[in-house]
Structures are given as structure tokens and as C-alpha cells.
């Protein structure tokens, strides 16, 4: 599927791109090459191939899940203007 000039102009308009007259031929060529690549990928037979969440079968080294900060909720709420039942009270904004 090859795009024509009018289709590229329409795509540029919908994407709110300002293309100069001199840019349209190269943009058309670039979009056509992208669509060609998509056609090549769609032509590959993927029947029987299990989908991957990530193309590399690498495992990530994760750090240990340890507490690095202590709970300072009481200290923060002590300086808050209004607190009730552990929640910060704020002025009503929507009626």
C-alpha cells in the first residue's frame, strides 16, 4: 500500500503538521517506507509462536524490598492546619 500526495497532505492536516511543498515528497517516501516495513512484518508467519512480554529473556536484578524511610505521619500531621482521624482536612472547592 503506497500513499499518495493527497493522503500525506490529509495526514499532515489531521496531525496538525505544517509541511512545506518541498517536504511533501520526502515525507511521502518516508511514510511509504514505514508502511512497507509494516507489510514485511505482517507477512511473517507467527502461528505457533508464543507472545513475549519482552523480547529479551533477561531477568532484572531487583533490590531487596526494605523500609528506607520511617513513618513520619504523626510529625507531618502535627504541623497540618486541620486533621481528623488521620486525614488532612482541606477547604471545600466544589459545591
Swiss-Prot record:
GO-annotated molecular function: asparaginyl-tRNA synthase (glutamine-hydrolyzing) activity; ATP binding; glutaminyl-tRNA synthase (glutamine-hydrolyzing) activity
Q: Which PANTHER family match?
A: GLUTAMYL-TRNA(GLN) AMIDOTRANSFERASE SUBUNIT C, MITOCHONDRIAL (PTHR15004:SF0)
The alphabetical list of record keywords is: ATP-binding, Ligase, Nucleotide-binding, Protein biosynthesis
Name recorded for this polypeptide: Aspartyl/glutamyl-tRNA(Asn/Gln) amidotransferase subunit C
Protein source organism: Ectopseudomonas mendocina (strain ymp)
Q: Which HAMAP family match?
A: GatC (MF_00122)
Q: Does the keyword Ligase apply?
A: yes
Q: Which family does it belong to?
A: Belongs to the GatC family.
Q: Provide a GO biological process annotation.
A: glutaminyl-tRNAGln biosynthesis via transamidation
**Assembly and binders:** Heterotrimer of A, B and C subunits.
User: For this protein, what is the EC number?
Assistant: 6.3.5.-
Decide whether keyword Protein biosynthesis is in the record. Answer: yes
Q: What is the role of this chain?
A: Allows the formation of correctly charged Asn-tRNA(Asn) or Gln-tRNA(Gln) through the transamidation of misacylated Asp-tRNA(Asn) or Glu-tRNA(Gln) in organisms which lack either or both of asparaginyl-tRNA or glutaminyl-tRNA synthetases. The reaction takes place in the presence of glutamine and ATP through an activated phospho-Asp-tRNA(Asn) or phospho-Glu-tRNA(Gln).
Task: Report which reactions are catalysed by this protein.
Answer: L-glutamyl-tRNA(Gln) + L-glutamine + ATP + H2O = L-glutaminyl-tRNA(Gln) + L-glutamate + ADP + phosphate + H(+); L-aspartyl-tRNA(Asn) + L-glutamine + ATP + H2O = L-asparaginyl-tRNA(Asn) + L-glutamate + ADP + phosphate + 2 H(+)
Amino acid at each position: 500500500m503506497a500513499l499518495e500526495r493527497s493522503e500525506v497532505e490529509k495526514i499532515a492536516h489531521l496531525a496538525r503538521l505544517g509541511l512545506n511543498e518541498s517536504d511533501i515528497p520526502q515525507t511521502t517516501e518516508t511514510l511509504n517506507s514505514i508502511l512497507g516495513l509494516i507489510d514485511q512484518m505482517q507477512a511473517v508467519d507467527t502461528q505457533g509462536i508464543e507472545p513475549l512480554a519482552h523480547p529479551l529473556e533477561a531477568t532484572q536484578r531487583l533490590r531487596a524490598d526494605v523500609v528506607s524511610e520511617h513513618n513520619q505521619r504523626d510529625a507531618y500531621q502535627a504541623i497540618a492546619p486541620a486533621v481528623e482521624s488521620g486525614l488532612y482536612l482541606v477547604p471545600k472547592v466544589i459545591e
